[in-house]
Amino acid sequence: ADIESISVLKDASSTAIYGARGSNGVILIQTKRGSQGEFHVTYKTKLAIAEPMQRIETMGPNEFIRLKQDMGRLKNNYSGEQLDPLVGSIISASEKVNYAKGITNDWQDYVFRTVFTMDHQLSFQGGNEKTTYMASVSYLDNPGVVYNSNYQRTNVYASINQKMNDWLSVGLTTQFVNRETGGATPNLEHAIKQSPYGIYKDETGAYYEEPMDYSNLPNPMKDVNADQKRTGRNFMANGFLDLKLPVKGLSFRSQF
């Protein structure tokens, strides 16, 4: 939001200015600055809906039961009642409870979600022949289509340019950025391998450790309450001094 223009220097021009560091080209980003004129305020907001582009196709409940029956016949020589989902041995006791009640889980429903993304930007600027200024604050809130993958960013930017006299100008730009990311995200691999009859949460509301009981495949959501939120803060400041030399068309500029 605070970028005014982007330009690319290539070949000899980049090497002449930046030396060996510019041998592969240089990208120059010009941030916005104040302009002469009356003080004015600008507010922009963007709202968007985000959802997973594509889900992974997995077996449905009936396909899962047929698979367990085939595995029971081929691997354990099961037959008759042993292959019955309710009285047999092809699924665990906890899965039988859900099977009897007709309760199934699409584990990707817990991993993925549809979210609203918000981006707010507020800026003001103004100035006169001697002084120009600009300041802005923006806030981005992106909950993330994967559970716990939320990202929040607050950006505060300010710049001021001062023309001291006909041959000297100075300026200062500052920026503060605060970023916050979510905690532990679900394990998608564990989600797509789970039984559709596996238990999602126990009677206390806690995530069930191993939904299939007989497998060491953990609940993909079991770690999402872990305190793994991360915060990053950056502060940047740079200034410049522009000196017009007593030679027509020649000036000296120092940035720091």
Please report, for each region that a protein language model flagged, where it lies by residue.
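N-terminal, post-signal-peptide soluble/periplasmic segments
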Residues: 10-99, 166-190
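Charge-patterned, long linear interaction tracts outside catalytic cores
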Residues: 228-232, 236-256
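Extended, hydrophobic alpha-helical segments in both membrane/secreted and soluble proteins
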Residues: 3, 156-158, 254
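Short coil turns and loop connectors of transmembrane beta-barrels in diderm outer membranes
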Residues: 37, 129-130, 166, 246-248
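Transmembrane beta-strands of outer-membrane beta-barrel proteins
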Residues: 41-43, 133-135, 170-172, 250-254
